[in-house]
Amino acid sequence: MLNKLQRYLSDVNINSNFVHGNNRLLEFSTNSLNFLAEYNPDSDPTYFRIMLPRIQSEDLQLDKEALDRIMVINSTYKVGKIIRIGKSLWMSAEFFINPTENNMLVFPRAISLLTDMYNDYFSPSHE
């Protein structure tokens, strides 16, 4: 699955690299955002996840307003979620797909979904 994603990214002139030689994590940047894609066929060959890691960290203050904003975004984008990992917020979109089918449309949709979520989260109307 990540090889298919890498081919798609190459076709649209986006560089990508496997993280630390690990063939289960692929990193790439587009629209000034750093993405991380995960696929582990040994664990579940139908599960594919793409993330925006550490969108907000260290000085993370999850007050009521921030939590409300997260809840609105999580309910608006059904397959996308904002989660807290340690002292950071991550955005994640998860899909169950058949790895033997042509899944090329999933990739631009996932990237667009996370980009939209990111823009909504950091929109001036929410600050």
Which stretches of residues belong to each language-model region?
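Short, well-ordered, aromatic-rich surface patches in folded extracellular/luminal domains
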Residues: L113-N119
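Flexible helix-coil linker/hinge segments at domain or subdomain boundaries
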Residues: N119-E127
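Long, continuous compositionally biased terminal/linker segments
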Residues: T30-E58
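Hydrophobic residues embedded in beta-strands of well-ordered beta-sheets
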Residues: N23-L26, T46-F48, L89
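Short, internal acidic amphipathic alpha-helical interface segments
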Residues: R49-S88, S92
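Charge-rich, low-complexity N-terminal segments
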Residues: M1-L36, S75-V79, R84
